[in-house]
């Protein structure tokens, strides 16, 4: 305060800034500070983006004035030069290495992902692994209509990964942690969900419950209930878990817009969210991504353009029709899984699918006996 009072130019600030206000700023600084390079880079990108938008807007206004000035001739070059200057100034492209300088590193990464005949971590469904696996930097999405077992599929994947000693973060917009706990214990014990939640189980089953709770305590697993996803909270949660507990796989249940605003805004928001998970989290951090998305009654992924643009693989979960169950046989299960988009392997034709067995009471998915495709005459 003495320094501020010593100069006429700064004296007015001594009346505004009290010791208490300065202390408040100091206390807040720790909360506002960024504690990792990635978080700092994210803020820098936001600042540069705002600066680029400001300068681009100002240049475009000048270009607009040129277009309205009939005395100006041959304005194309002037407009091109003005826009090019802005694009060059804010270009984020660093030195671009030649392919010969990166091929050895890339091939080493390919080799590092090879294990037990698969690239990456296999799913619990052997036939699905012939099409795609769980890989760092990739985002695998299960799609299904509402209330058709998307969340239960993700839970099954999570447990299978925990059995493989993977570190898993499960971000849930559907179930709070209490309800999720009931589901995962029903899955692990094989006790029907209704009996488990109402206490209608035997002493032997109670022992099984305690055993599975004890096992879960040994796993590297975090479940976070976030009713409404937003990019900053998701990114912060992932970084915190990665730093404090380690993280191999991120599971997102599920990808959807906030529903606020008009349909276009929600659509754009969803696109940015999926892009952030695929590129900023899975890509930049080297984390495997699994998620779920809503499908329409016609078997299409809702907002498919935005999701499909970023997803590595999309697999559709559907009920088998009574005719399909009769034709395939009951031993071939009651669900079908179709790989409808795949950047890491083959896709299925319209009549192809993987046969699964689904028991909603026990929160269980298993691969069933695979059906023999039949050609109708």
Language-model features: where?
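The Walker A/P-loop phosphate-binding site
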Residues: 92-191
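Structural motif
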Residues: 141, 223, 248-253, 290
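C-terminal regions of RecA-like/P-loop NTPase motor modules
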Residues: 231-250, 264, 283-284, 297-377
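Helical hairpin unit composed of two closely spaced alpha helices linked by a short loop
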Residues: 247-279
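Interdomain "pre-motor" coupling segment immediately N-terminal to P-loop NTPase/helicase cores
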Residues: 33-101
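Noncatalytic partner-interaction/assembly domains of nucleic-acid and motor enzyme complexes
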Residues: 1-50
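Substrate-engagement module of ASCE P-loop NTPases
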Residues: 269-295, 307-313
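Cytosolic-facing regulatory segments adjacent to core modules
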Residues: 129, 165-246, 260, 352-355
């Amino acid at each position: 305060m003495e320094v501020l009072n010593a100069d006429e130019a700064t004296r007015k600030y001594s009346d505004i800034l009290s010791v208490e206000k300065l202390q408040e700023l100091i206390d807040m600084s720790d909360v506002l500070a960024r504690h990792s390079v990635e978080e700092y880079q994210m803020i820098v990108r936001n600042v540069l983006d705002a600066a680029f938008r400001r300068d681009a807007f100002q240049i475009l206004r000048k270009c607009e004035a040129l277009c309205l000035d009939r005395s100006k001739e041959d304005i194309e070059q002037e407009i091109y030069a003005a826009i090019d200057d802005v694009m060059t100034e804010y270009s984020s492209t660093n030195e671009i290495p030649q392919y010969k300088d990166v091929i050895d590193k890339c091939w080493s990464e390919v080799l590092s992902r090879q294990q037990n005949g698969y690239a990456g971590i296999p799913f619990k469904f052997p036939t699905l692994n012939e099409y795609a696996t769980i890989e760092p930097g990739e985002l695998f999405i299960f799609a299904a209509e509402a209330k058709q077992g998307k969340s239960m599929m993700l839970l099954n994947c999570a447990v299978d990964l925990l059995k493989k000693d993977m570190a898993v973060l499960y971000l849930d917009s559907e179930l709070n942690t209490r309800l999720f706990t009931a589901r995962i214990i029903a899955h692990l014990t094989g006790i029907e969900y209704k009996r488990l939640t109402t206490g209608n189980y035997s002493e032997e089953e109670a022992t099984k419950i305690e055993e599975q709770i004890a096992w879960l305590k040994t796993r590297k697993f975090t479940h976070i209930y976030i009713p409404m996803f937003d990019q900053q909270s998701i990114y912060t949660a992932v970084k915190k878990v990665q730093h404090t507990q380690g993280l191999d796989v991120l599971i997102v249940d599920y990808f959807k817009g906030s529903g606020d605003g008009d349909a276009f805004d929600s659509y754009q928001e969803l696109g940015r969210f999926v892009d952030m998970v695929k590129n900023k989290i899975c890509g930049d951090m080297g984390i495997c991504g699994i998620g779920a998305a809503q499908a329409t009654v016609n078997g299409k992924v809702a907002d498919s353009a935005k999701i499909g643009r970023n997803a590595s693989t999309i697999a559709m979960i559907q009920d088998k029709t009574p005719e399909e169950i009769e034709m395939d046989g009951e031993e071939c299960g009651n669900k079908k899984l179709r790989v409808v988009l795949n950047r890491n392997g083959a896709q299925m034709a319209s009549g192809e699918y993987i046969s699964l067995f689904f028991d909603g009471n026990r929160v269980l998915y298993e691969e069933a006996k695979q059906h023999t495709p039949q050609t109708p005459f």
